[in-house]
């Protein structure tokens, strides 16, 4: 977890430098003659340079999207209709599952359509909507992962006070604050990005309207965007990760103090799925944005294609793994899934 914390701090620094460098390049271009006709739509480049890969990519992403819908949908239904799951942990898990469905549905369907129809243009308003939902879901997920870590900390380190600290009012409020904060953050970032003038180049070198890719096309000062994104990263990436880090430090200390091997194993099993999701989530973000800049000079086109495939892992594979990890590592979830599928009582 210490490595994850350091990685995220590095991500912040590199992310800010990356956007600032892009702005410097745009500022230099503005000194020349640029077509000042404001763009009314954007063109999503995707993997247009690799037509053979696109076919494989379409089939792969379609299968994964169906798994996301089914897997997370089953977890949501189980958390609602099974009384065994009316607890803070499964309430947060249900929220995370719903978030994963919303997050992927904001970009995957349009990506699939563009791959099969070769229609890659997206309207200005459509890009804004896609950017808003993508950023909102990402921000909310960071907060939810932090809330889930705090839930595990209270359950393991303060079990007697767990019903009091994590009362129904408390955990519903925690989830609501996560959603509201993520939405407000995304609205601010989206409005600041889409208020910028976009002239000349309208090609987004990405599968979706990712905010950093869009900012590169702006032909105006983006200093305010940089400042707000740094603040946003601190609030929605670093702070939740610090909560996760310290929660697991206390959890680890408590587990090591247990005399029973069975108790230690049971305590760790309740955290392993969440910890795995956190490592994948933050690890992928770090790998996407904190790679050494020197690598961009060698095989830039291939590296850009690799970055897009990594973004697939971040945007599709992680939401797909969430229900799988929680189902495989949790007997209650597996029993509930069997109950929903077979409609037989759970013993």
UniProtKB/Swiss-Prot annotation:
Its main location: membrane. It is found in: Cell membrane. It is a multi-pass membrane protein. The keyword Metal-binding does not apply. Residues 77-84, 151-169, 248-267, 329-347 are cytoplasmic. Keywords: Cell membrane, Disulfide bond, G-protein coupled receptor, Glycoprotein, Membrane, Olfaction, Receptor, Sensory transduction, Transducer, Transmembrane, Transmembrane helix. Glycans are attached at residue 35. One of its GO terms (biological process) is detection of chemical stimulus involved in sensory perception of smell. Residues 1-55, 106-129, 191-227, 289-307 are extracellular. GO terms for cellular component: plasma membrane. GO terms for molecular function: G protein-coupled receptor activity; olfactory receptor activity. The chain crosses the membrane at residues 56-76, 85-105, 130-150, 170-190, 228-247, 268-288, 308-328. Disulfide bonds join 127-219. Belongs to the G-protein coupled receptor 1 family. Odorant receptor. This is Olfactory receptor 13C3. The gene is OR13C3.
